[in-house]
Amino acid sequence: MEKQLKQFYKFLEVDKKVSNNTLQSYKRDLKQFSEYLDEKGIKYNKVTEQDIKEYLEHLSEEEGKKPSTISRTIASIRAFYQYEVKNKKTMQNPTENIQSPKIEKRTPCILTSQEVELLLEQPKDVDLKGTRDKAMLEFAYATGMRVTEIISLNIEDVDLKEGTVMCKNGSRTRTIPLGKMSLDALKEYIEDA
């Protein structure tokens, strides 16, 4: 199964152009699944729907995994077997009839304007680290970008003259305007760095 997994990971990286975080999630999920199969003496191309159900039960009851983790695991295993079926490495996808568990939708905790102001005042720009942290917080607040998106930015992704940033997420790219505070904090960090 190791050889097949390597080919699948290459497909995800090269053809699907998934983000590094997504790729790492697939690797983690499928490594754990592969170890389970080895432990049970089951060949990957002989896995049945019942084997999948027992594995998911193992994750839930013995390992205490949350429904969201189990749902992601199902998606990883399903994608791997879809790839294998498409490439005629196995005859059928044992996850075809497997349903993902219901996931409770949690409403995000929204900060008040006062809390946001307090947060943005936290980094003291007395050194480069403080200037960087202030720029990142202003940037995150102004753009709504995730931390992983911000730290993967390159200097060429930011247009200081236009006041925009190009956010690349996998194969998608979007242009996001920067606010004045964010732009000023970013310029200060670039000048100090």
Model regions and ranges:
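Conserved catalytic core of the tyrosine transesterase superfamily
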Residues: 1-193
